[in-house]
Curated annotation (Swiss-Prot):
Organism: Onion yellows phytoplasma (strain OY-M)
Keyword terms of this UniProt record: Cytoplasm, Hydrolase, Nuclease, Ribosome biogenesis
Subcellular location: Cytoplasm
Membership in a protein family: Belongs to the YqgF nuclease family.
InterPro entries: RNaseH-like_sf (IPR012337), YqgF (IPR005227), YqgF/RNaseH-like_dom (IPR006641), YqgF/RNaseH-like_dom_sf (IPR037027)
Signal sequence range: none
Main localization (coarse): cytoplasm
Name of the featured protein: Putative pre-16S rRNA nuclease
Length: 151
């Protein structure tokens, strides 16, 4: 079991029946961790496996994908993410939960997997955790850029 520094973060790509999970132990590089499959819209079933991951990796920050429409409108999927954020904050009070614009992250993930010659089944299996990796990496890059400007 890997132990990590105090700036360990998770990236989450929440779908109707999948949760893609990415991890950064250093605050610099995100890597895909896993995809959790669950019954459609049964988001409460994600709490126990997330609790294990949060404890195992000593997670301090969760970056949850926020699926805005391309015109910046907030739809039902964004509302679901917002509600899930509240659930995470209530269950894991010690963890900071951030909503992060995830537009096109799944499209990027699928393109990346196709570029790496992954088969269709593998693409469907991995797209959510790769999307979570993109979400988390975008957040980490943003933090690094804005932290460097302050110093």
């Amino acid at each position: 079991m890997l132990k990590c520094q105090n700036n360990a973060s998770l990236g989450l790509d929440l779908g109707e029946k999948t949760l893609g999970i990415a991890l950064s132990q250093t605050g610099i590089i995100a890597q895909n961790l896993k995809t959790i499959f669950f019954a459609t819209h049964k988001y409460d079933r994600l709490i126990a496996p997330l609790q294990e991951i949060i404890f195992q990796y000593q997670i301090k920050t969760i970056v949850l994908g926020y699926p805005k429409h391309m015109n910046n409108d907030i739809g039902i999927k964004a509302k679901i993410s917002s509600d899930f954020k509240k659930t995470l904050e209530n269950k894991f009070e010690q963890v900071k939960v951030i909503l992060w614009d995830e537009r096109l992250s799944t499209v990027q993930a699928i393109q990346m997997l196709k570029t790496n010659n992954k088969k269709k089944g593998k693409i469907l299996q991995m797209k959510d955790e790769i999307a979570a990796t993109i979400i988390l990496q975008n957040y980490l890059d943003y933090i690094k850029l804005h932290t460097n400007k302050e110093h």
